[in-house]
From Swiss-Prot:
Heteromultimer composed of small subunits (RfcS) and large subunits (RfcL). One of its GO terms (cellular component) is DNA replication factor C complex. This is Replication factor C small subunit. One of its GO terms (biological process) is DNA-templated DNA replication. SUPFAM superfamilies: P-loop containing nucleoside triphosphate hydrolases, post-AAA+ oligomerization domain-like. The keyword ATP-binding applies. It holds the Pfam family AAA. The keyword ATP-binding applies. Part of the RFC clamp loader complex which loads the PCNA sliding clamp onto DNA. It comes from Nanoarchaeum equitans (strain Kin4-M).
Amino acid sequence: MEIWTEKYRPKRIDDIINQEEIKKALKSFVEKKNMPHLLFAGPPGTGKTTAALALAHELYGDAWRENFLELNASDERGIDVIRHKVKEFARAKPIGDVPFKIVFLDEADALTRDAQQALRRIMEKYSQSTRFILSCNYFSKIIEPIQSRVTVFKFKPLEKEAFRELINRIVKGEGLILENEDEIINALYDIAEGDLRKAINILQAAAMMSKTITVDRLYEIASIAKPKEIDEVLNKAMQGNFLEARSMLIDLMLKYGMSGEDVIKAIQKRVWSLPISDREKLMILDKIGDIEFRIVEGADDLVQLDALLAWLGLGKYKNFTS
């Protein structure tokens, strides 16, 4: 079975959605057959890799594979491996009338500061024959000497209507049936948090089980509790029904295989929907931050979640004290 993220990946710059200013710049590079080193920054699944591939397709045509080297900083065994691969790749002349090749380094922010310094030297050494496109989720994790040597493009998350358009294209292409289109789109958008790649992978996993897609199946595959289920736990806790809230929470953790951190993240997303004042919401979020820190530091998940439910039940957030 073909992977849908590749099957439906745009091959042309014009087909990229939601990044209009970036598209204009990329098309200008194609017309001039020249470009600087680039840095694509933005959340996962917003089209950074797609943009790099589309640029390569339009610059090099059928010879794009010979002129485009894709590396992943998380997968490679170190900067020495990257240096060796770039050296071997840059040694051969470009095929066609574009006077440079492209090295695409994904997850560049995963490199240590020392490795990034080494990468900067590699970029300088091979700049005559090679252009680098670096991709990262966190722009702030890229060292300033690299930032100053690249043109930065910041990718924004997909807006919901663009997201809907792309999902519906896949639904039509694969002959899927959505039990309720609005609910399915909203659920996928909520689960993936704007990450289109994640949304497509979840949709494909659901389709392998049945051509009819339901909201329940999407959340089960994603191992995330539905928002209304988290709301019910919070409401019970805030009403002082500690044992009932605790029982419901344990059931959700078992049903979806959620860790303590997963639960905390789900609760954080629902706090702003609670019918309480903004200041009370801030107090709850502050408490959640403390609980999350303890869990990350190794404290028992259930003990910490119990403490949070009890804190909510006692109405501590109303007193503006911890």
